[in-house]
Amino acid sequence: MFHVKQPLINCQIIRTLLPAGSGVSRETGEKLALYESLLTRWTRTVNLVSRNDVEHIRDRHILDSLQLLPLLEPLPGPLIDIGSGGGLPGLVLAIATGRETHLVEADQRKAAFLREAARATESNVTVHACRIEQCNIAPAPVLTARALAPLNVLLGYALRLLSKNGVALFMKGKTAEQELTEAATEWHMRVQLSPSRTHPEASILRIDEISRV
């Protein structure tokens, strides 16, 4: 069904990131490999990932994004991914789960890539080519972002885009704990911090019960 030259994404590797008992089909591996091929090709002309990372897209970006699967698995309903860029993590999660996903990306060229990749991988995705502040999207139960903005800013987006009892999953770098300390002066929230399994200095923040101080 999907014709790609490079090896398929190893489904056994994906399974290590999933809750016990979850299955990953060969078709999912094929779709992720197709996405990887498209991301590599488009990056030659559109700045989707760092040029230094082109040879490491699978490990540094795709598998990194798949780390959210165990946190996402118990959360029902649509997902909104903001600042989607090259589809990390939003499109990767849409491919892996089949979940209804909304990708928000203001850059028109990146949005064009997202539409093409979503079409090619037959993903349940809607691309919103607009600034986060200006997008008219119904609130969703899950919000994701990866290396997008300071936590204070992300929480402001979450307050508007998350539905009642919604959960934010933010992928942060080595400043995660500092950002949490700073955000605590302006926000009430419940936080679960998990170390990244692909980047030693990175973290994943699971945040809910968000409100302003």
Curated annotation (Swiss-Prot):
Which GO terms fall under molecular function for this chain's record?
rRNA (guanine-N7-)-methyltransferase activity
Describe its function.
Specifically methylates the N7 position of guanine in position 527 of 16S rRNA.
Q: Which residues cross the membrane?
A: none
Where is the protein found, in the record's own terms? Answer: Cytoplasm
Xref: SUPFAM superfamilies? S-adenosyl-L-methionine-dependent methyltransferases
* Name of the encoding gene: rsmG
Record protein name field: Ribosomal RNA small subunit methyltransferase G
- Its top-level enzyme class, in one word, is transferase
**Per the UniProt record, which EC number(s) apply here?**
2.1.1.170
